[in-house]
């Protein structure tokens, strides 16, 4: 069950993920990579404590060391204010509007998904693309976050089964092992 989005909104985000990062050839596409999970975790980051903002570390455990990326870090009060403002918007709160009103990710997603239409999932791909192109603010934000979700650290909810890294032939995080001199020389 989604953390922030309704099931319909989640399904729309998954469909849009495949429009933006299409499944082509060996690339699985945005839906299969868990972009909707990443977006939902980001939008609902403050539904858990600590919030899903900064993954722990120093190691993921994928190349040795203790797996601690999944242990999210507490935020300072300034970090929390900044991230809540970014995600939730200023909401008329003086402490969030010192530079004026801020439209948050949550509002951008809710409005963008609604503007795509309640029948978006039933439309063919050409109509879905036409509608998505008409929603510039939503499309622009989504593109950035779809790339983060598809190719970022899987602890944030995306890059399912490391499929994004595999699709772009990225070996992923290698600490604490690191790279050998030979591996570095061959990549140059």
Whereabouts are the PLM-identified features?
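Short, flexible, mixed-charge glycine/proline-rich loop motifs
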Residues: 6
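Mature-region segments of soluble proteins
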Residues: 9-19, 26-188
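Short, Gly/Pro- and small/polar-rich lid/capping loops
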Residues: 1-3
């Amino acid at each position: 069950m989604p953390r922030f989005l309704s099931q319909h909104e989640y399904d729309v985000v998954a469909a849009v993920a495949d429009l933006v990062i299409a499944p082509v050839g060996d690339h699985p596409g945005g839906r299969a990579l868990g972009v909707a999970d990443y977006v939902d975790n980001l939008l609902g980051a403050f539904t858990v404590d600590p919030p899903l903002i900064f993954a722990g570390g120093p190691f993921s455990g994928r190349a040795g060391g203790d797996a601690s990326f999944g242990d999210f870090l507490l935020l300072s009060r300034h970090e929390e204010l900044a991230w809540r403002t970014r995600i939730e918007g200023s909401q008329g709160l003086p402490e969030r509007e010192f530079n004026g009103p801020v439209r948050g990710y949550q509002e951008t997603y809710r409005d963008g998904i609604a503007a795509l239409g309640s029948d978006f999932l039933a439309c063919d791909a050409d109509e879905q693309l036409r509608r998505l192109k008409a929603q510039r603010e939503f499309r622009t934000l989504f593109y950035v976050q779809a790339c983060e979700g598809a190719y970022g650290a899987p602890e944030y909810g995306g890059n399912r089964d490391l499929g994004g890294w595999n699709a772009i032939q990225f070996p992923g995080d290698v600490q604490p092992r690191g790279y050998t001199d030979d591996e570095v020389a061959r990549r140059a």
